[in-house]
A protein has these predicted regions:
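Acidic, glycine-enriched active-site microenvironments
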Residues: 1-108
Length: 108
């Protein structure tokens, strides 16, 4: 699948997400978790990744590897923060740097 088709498919999926707190899990073509993030509004945050526009080098590289994503709705931002932290520790995703070493504290 070409890059533009892949991004269009992912953006369409992202635009169907709810506007609630949650955690999103980016995966590559092998289904391996490459990034875990949290958001106050899942739809807004996840769709930003797949829209045209400026991205820093790390984000652009990560997006180029994303083939699919999952998400988990949370009741509160604090629940999302805790879940994000636990998932990063479980999967140690390539593009999550801040929480990998378990030395820094999670924040909203």
């Amino acid at each position: 699948m070409q890059k533009q088709e892949r991004l269009a498919r992912l953006l369409e999926k992202a635009n169907s997400l709810p506007l609630v707190p949650g955690v999103y899990i980016m995966k590559n073509t092998s289904g391996k978790v490459i990034y875990v993030g949290k958001s106050r509004k899942l739809k807004n945050r996840v769709s930003q990744y797949f829209q045209n526009g400026e991205k820093n080098v790390k984000t652009a590289r990560m997006v180029s590897c994303v083939d699919n994503f999952d998400y988990i709705v949370c009741r509160t931002e604090m629940e999302a923060l805790s879940l994000e932290n636990n998932l990063i520790k479980r999967y140690t995703p390539k593009y999550n740097i801040r929480l990998k070493d378990a030395k820094s504290y999670p924040y909203i």
